[in-house]
Amino acid sequence: FMELCAAYIAKLKQFQTLVGRKVKAGQTDDLLKLTNVARLSESDAKEFFQNFDASFLKLYPDFISQFNRLLRDDAQIVPRRGELLNTELRIFALLRMGITDSSKMATLLFLSPQTIYNHRSAVRAKAIDRDSFETQVAAIGQLSAKNVANNA
């Protein structure tokens, strides 16, 4: 995570230097072109998701299997080959981390709030217990009080 932050800070500094040079040189047309192109690139997003996925799964290595236990057998969610998590799993990974607001999730996943809402609703419809599904997801990986007491 720290490595990722450092890399983005370095990119931001490079961009800031470039903008400073363009402003001093009066190259405002070039700056306007940069603002149209300087959006998050596909490779930046892919790298971000790979780092997020790997970090999250280090914290919660059994997340996918525990998550799927909350879904009907015919509705299991499995990432594609080469993926650690997919969009649905990332949404619920964020929920597990305490981020429940769809707008915040949308910002973090580069999606619209409506897309987040649609995914959440679709996955909730596949749950064994729809009413407590998100509460159960939020508890994935927690030690129960009973387990703690038995190990004491």
Segments (PLM) and residue ranges:
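Conserved HAMP-HisKA connector
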Residues: F1-A6, K13
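Phosphate/oxyanion-binding loops and surfaces in catalytic or ligand/nucleic-acid-binding neighborhoods
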Residues: A7, L18, L59
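Cytosolic nucleotide-binding catalytic cores of signal-transduction proteins
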Residues: K46-A152
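Histidine phosphotransfer helical core of two-component systems
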Residues: K13-D53, D74-P79
